[in-house]
Amino acid sequence: MAVRRRSALLLAGAVAVPVVGIGGYVAYSGSTYSQGWRMGQLFKLSNRRSWQRLFMAAGEGELSLGQDSSRAAWAGADGQSVQNPWLFSASVEQIAQYEPLLGRSVAVRYHQLQKKLTAFHGDTDYRIDEIVPVGAGRPPVGACAVSGRGARSSGTRIGRIVKSTVKGTLAKTHECTVQVGNSGNVFLEMSVPNEAMHDCVTASLLSGQPVAISYVENIIRNPLNRDTNYEIVGIRPVES
């Protein structure tokens, strides 16, 4: 299922130039390391000041990934620390705009800054672009598949997709995170082979529903192309 493309802003110094977004996301040339969606329960939004920004507040938020997960931290496939809940920064105006969504299951579209400007612009290097309720008014997720190559094992997992991202500087990779099962703190990182499957992964995330994810485990992995040995080759809806 194709995700709707939208226009974006190209940040060049202090000048914003409209361009076509990459994979449906806002693109900031030279300033963005990753961009994508995360799904879960929105349970905190706040405005706060620090000694670096005494005269202006910055918005901060927390998203508990998936359904009924708890506080945890672990090392991701790329070696970076992953935290649940996921912390993000926003403008004061965005905090007010999205406050009615507190306590609901939502999808957050974000971009991650290449260079941290946390001292004056927020506590994190993640900036939100929009927050939407999951599932509301969206068509059911359809089945999608690609062929897998070089596999030494294969299988299917049932779970919710809680993260869909495009990341990297010169070489871009498509990655996702799956909450295995119906709830809890078991998260599995997987790589996405192409943009068509990435669109399907993102559509599954926006639905908020569990899906059956078919994958192969590749013997050889090019780290420039993907973060994990697990490659998604098919997604289909789970009958309730």
Predicted regions and their residues:
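OB-fold/S1-family single-stranded nucleic acid-binding modules
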Residues: 113-142, 218-240
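Short boundary/loop segments of OB/S1/cold-shock single-stranded nucleic-acid-binding domains
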Residues: 22-34, 138-153
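OB-fold (S1/OB) nucleic-acid-binding surfaces
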Residues: 52-84, 171-190
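N-terminal export leaders
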Residues: 7-10
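Short nucleic-acid-contacting surface segments enriched for D/E, G, S/T with interspersed K/R
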Residues: 82-83, 89-109, 195-213
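Core hydrophobic alpha-helical transmembrane segments of single-pass membrane proteins
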Residues: 13-21
